[in-house]
Amino acid sequence: MVARLRAKPGGDRVAVVVGDMARAEDLPAGAFAVVLVAFNTFFSLTTAEDQARCFAAVADRLTADGSFVVEGFVPDDELIEAGSKVEVRSLTARRVVLTVSRHDAVTQRAEGQFVELTEEGGVRLRPWSLRFAPPEELDAMAAAAGLVLAERWSAWDGTPFTAASAHHVSRYRRPGSSPA
């Protein structure tokens, strides 16, 4: 992924750190104006403790008016109550991708495989595992780390977040810091 970023125009201007975002020692030293965890990546931390450690480590590295931005899906009742399921993710004449997953409402864990079937290549398995958390739980983790919710949208274009939103972009900051 880093190589793909570097190949893009301006990709060399983005600071990239490869490490475990739950381990403070893996994060770079210094103060940052923005720390972004995009596209459900935060949920790749598969325990509540690791998620809370990430908030604390990031809060420790923000400038006085810095922001921590988390993008993720909003767990819905269907996900939480699903148990196990198989869904068609994509289907063409030469390729089928299935999502096979199992969800546990108590642990807020989901694990699964993207199963790719092709005429030419047989079967390819792409495993995944996550711990989902509703925005309110993320807000509590932020508060425990000394951050407050500054803004929340349902999309990057600033669409207002509502109870019906399927996704969120949440920006956290230190209390009393500049709201911008």
Task: State what each model feature region is.
Residues D50-S67:
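A short glycine-rich, Lys/Arg-flanked "PGG" loop and its adjoining helix->strand segment in the class I
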Residues G10-R23:
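Conserved SAM-binding strand-loop segment of SAM-dependent methyltransferases
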Residues F43-L45:
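A short His-aromatic
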Residues E25-V35:
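A short acidic, Gly/Pro-enriched loop at the edge of an enzyme's catalytic core
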Residues V37-F39:
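A short beta-strand submotif of the Rossmann-like class I SAM-dependent methyltransferase core
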Residues R131-A180:
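C-terminal lobe and adjacent flexible extensions of AdoMet/dcAdoMet transferase-like proteins
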Residues L5-R6:
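Conserved SAM-binding loop
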Residues V69-M141:
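SAM-dependent methyltransferase
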